[in-house]
Amino acid sequence: MFLITFSKAGQEDIVLTEDDLFDFQYEASCYSGESFELGGVNAKTLYLLIDNNTQRFSRGTFANCRVKLEIDGKFFGYYNTELPKRRNGVIELTAYDDMVKLDTEFPTDYTFPQTFWAVYAQCVFEAGLASEVSFDNVVLNGVWDNGIISADYTQYIYANSCRNLVAGMAEWNGGFAYINDVNKLQIDKFSKTVTREYSSGDLMELDYSDETVVFSKVKTSQKNKTYEMGTDAGYTLVLKNQYISYGLDDTMFETYLTKISEYYTVFELTPMSFTLAEPDFDLHVGDRIQVYDEEEQVAITGNVSKIAISGNCSMTVTCGGFENVSSSSGFTPTSYSQIQQSKQEAKGDGTAEKLQTTGSK
């Protein structure tokens, strides 16, 4: 069951359920494409088609609202609405979590050197996610925590948004960033420990690559020089966020790169996509999972890169890998957006059926 609460100053809260919706899409992810990468700063997305055939919701009702999402009694975060669209008795609405608030300028009068933690906390404050600069507003669970940005090359820092800085630091912490359930900025590494096991009998659909990605090298650049650690035996994990590396002195640069190399060398993952017969709402992006294919009698392992929940409470899970792996093995990636599909279908004749949450627990 969906419970969606809209709050706005000067207006009583509006609570919608699946009975009020023609469509529902939720998506959480930790990187944008199908290729495994560090430094993701993706916002969770909520997409709704609201039934307004009786014109019960006047213009402006859902504009600039704060949205609370609950599914089967579990809290799924707060969201900020974009301007809704109306047509044929339907209100189309997209909302994003507070990660989008980090799309604000970083202050140019900020002085360095500073620790990563201090810069994270400053970004949270600048974005309006906290009333003061405090380490308590940031949760670090990276390959290693913290780090130091020197006073050198800070013009690259000032030229970026807070979100870009968070992405760069999260990459060098060996993980990805997101807004957690208590609305704090959190940086997590990709887990090496399997926390969920499924068999193909638990799944409605299962597609996976014939090849497993095994990292054997980490590669990056700093000040027009390329640095590599590892061998050519497997795949290369590339750190791309150079404006953070510019701010690292040579000793720290090598130390941080070594820590990431030690963690991700021999890190294995198999690109896959599956739909659960029963949703698992305790599964999170970044979790390491294992799926046993009963027909092929093989176990495949990967890290969750995207979770999508649709209107009937079906839950599709994607574990990314590398684009060249997926294209060479016949793996069908799930980059096709269910949200875009819903938008196209909604632009038909305006006739649609209400949601049925038959798949929920």
Where are these regions (language model features)?
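Short secondary-structure boundary/capping segments within folded domains
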Residues: 35-40, 258-260, 318
